[in-house]
C-alpha cells in the first residue's frame, strides 16, 4: 500500500463532507474564535461554537482549531470552516465478529487470562442489546466445568484486541482490583498512529473528563473538580512514511485513554472512529478498527504472590497492516 502525503484541506474536500466557510472581515478582526462563531448568522451561540470546537469540527486556515487558537485574535482574511458532517461522528457499525474458541493464555482455580479478539465486548452492556461479549463466553466455559460466573477485574475496548483478565471469586477480584487502583500492573499496548511523535519517547500527562452524553473523553483543566489524571509513557518502535508503531505503557487506566491522549497530540490512531476530526481524506490508511492492541499484562498473583506476565501476539489484521506500511 503506497501512502499519500495529505494535501491541503481545500484540495482534498470530499463530497460526503459538507461545511460552512467564512472569511474574517475587517469588522470581525480581533474577535476570538468562539465569539466570531457565536454570531447569529453563523452558529448562533457561544455554547454551540464551543461544542463544535470540542468535537473537532472547527478549522482555521485549513488546520483544526487547537488550544493556541482559542484565545488568539482572528486576523483579516482568516478562513474559518465548520464541518457539518464530521467523519467518524456517526455511530459506526460494529466490527464483524464470528465467535470462536476462547484463546486462554492462562487459567487456574483463581483467575483466567485471555486474548480478546477485536470486535468483541469485554463485558455485556445493556445499551448494546444482545451483542456477545467475552464475559459471556467465559460464563459458558466455566459452566461447562461446573464453576460459577467470572468476575470483572478490568476491561479493554470492544475494537481493541489483546490481554484481558478475569477473577473466579470475590476475594481474588478484590485483590486484583486493588493492584489496579495502586497502578502496579504492567499494561503495555501497541498502537499505529498517524505522524511521527516527537520526541520519540516520553510521557503523556493530561486531565480528562468523561462526557456521559457523547460517550467520549474530553480534555479539561486540572482544577476541574471532575478532572481525572491520565498518564501514559510512550516509545516509538518503528516509523513509516506517514505513520508510526508506538509502544504505550499505562500508568493510569482511564476509558479510551490511549486513543484520546494520542489524538490530543495530533497522532490519531489509524482506524480510529471516535476521536477523529476533520475530513477523512486526511487519514489515508484504511483499517476497520482502531489500531490498538493490549500486548502485555503483568501483575502479582493474589494468592500465590508470584509475578506473572502474559503477552498476546498481534492479530492477523494488525500484522497485515504493518506489512502494508513496511512495503515501499
PLM-predicted stretches and their roles:
Residues 49, 131-138, 170, 181, ...:
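Pseudouridine synthase
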Residues 100-101, 217-224, 281-286:
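Short, P/G- and charge-enriched loop/turn segments at secondary-structure junctions
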Residues 104, 193, 233-236, 269:
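Conserved hydrophobic positions within beta-strands
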Residues 225-230, 274-278:
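PP2C/PPM family metal-dependent serine/threonine protein phosphatase catalytic domain
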